[in-house]
Amino acid sequence: MRVKKGDLVEVIAGKDRGKRGKVLRVIPREDRVIVEGINIVHRHMRPTPDMPQGGIVKNEAPIHISNVMLVCPNCDEKTRIGATYLEDGQKVRKCKKCDEVVDK
């Protein structure tokens, strides 16, 4: 997967199209990511010892990886990602638009 935890992504399809958020969790087995503030669902929680009152809780639900694009930290545009190798042999991700390295 080309998106990692902590990356800034933009939603390109679905009800939250155009919104940006930080990746909180990547689920590679299901090709899904959980993005902060995106795909909010309401869970009706029964009272438990942890939450004695119960109620409606808002959580982020996973969104398919094909519905998000990485936002390049250098050019601040949504972009596709390519891979390249540095002089020391380390594989890094790079922006296809500005050709800069995305990884820290």
Curated annotation (Swiss-Prot):
SUPFAM superfamilies: Translation proteins SH3-like domain. Keywords: Ribonucleoprotein, Ribosomal protein, RNA-binding, rRNA-binding. One of two assembly initiator proteins, it binds directly to the 5'-end of the 23S rRNA, where it nucleates assembly of the 50S subunit. One of the proteins that surrounds the polypeptide exit tunnel on the outside of the subunit. Part of the 50S ribosomal subunit. The gene is rplX. This is Large ribosomal subunit protein uL24. Belongs to the universal ribosomal protein uL24 family. It comes from Halothermothrix orenii (strain H 168 / OCM 544 / DSM 9562). One of its GO terms (molecular function) is rRNA binding. One of its GO terms (biological process) is translation. CDD domains: KOW_RPL26. GO terms for cellular component: ribonucleoprotein complex; ribosome. PANTHER family: MITOCHONDRIAL RIBOSOMAL PROTEIN L24.
